[in-house]
Swiss-Prot record:
GO biological process: translation
Superkingdom to which the source organism belongs: Bacteria
Keyword hit for 4Fe-4S: no
Gene name as annotated: rpsP
The name this protein goes by in its record: Small ribosomal subunit protein bS16
Cellular-component GO terms for this entry: cytoplasm; small ribosomal subunit
Species assigned in the record: Desulfatibacillum aliphaticivorans
MF terms in GO: structural constituent of ribosome
Keywords of the record: Ribonucleoprotein, Ribosomal protein
Family affiliation: Belongs to the bacterial ribosomal protein bS16 family.
Length: 87
């Protein structure tokens, strides 16, 4: 089972709200997930980002790979000291 950290879309039409989730790579975008490790609201000014740093570190140490978008969100929040591997 390959595990990814990716965005799951929620909210209303034209008002997206995303959960940052740990999920099996074969699950649908908004489908079953293992754990919610953060939220991202791009509509708010400035964008609201809430991360569970310890859980993200745990999953990445366990082999979970962030998608390109999640990797950029984490990098902008100062989560990495070096560039991580991408899913």
């Amino acid at each position: 089972m390959a595990v990814k950290i990716r965005l799951a879309r929620h909210g209303a039409k034209k008002r997206p709200f995303y959960r940052i989730v740990v999920t099996d790579s074969e699950s649908p975008r908004d489908g079953r997930f293992i754990e919610i490790v953060g939220t991202y609201n791009p509509v708010a000014e400035p964008a609201q980002i809430d991360l569970k740093d310890e859980r993200i570190k745990h999953w990445m140490e366990s082999g979970a790979l962030p998608t390109h978008t999640v990797r950029n969100i984490l990098k902008n929040q100062g989560f990495f000291s070096e560039a991580p591997q991408e899913a």
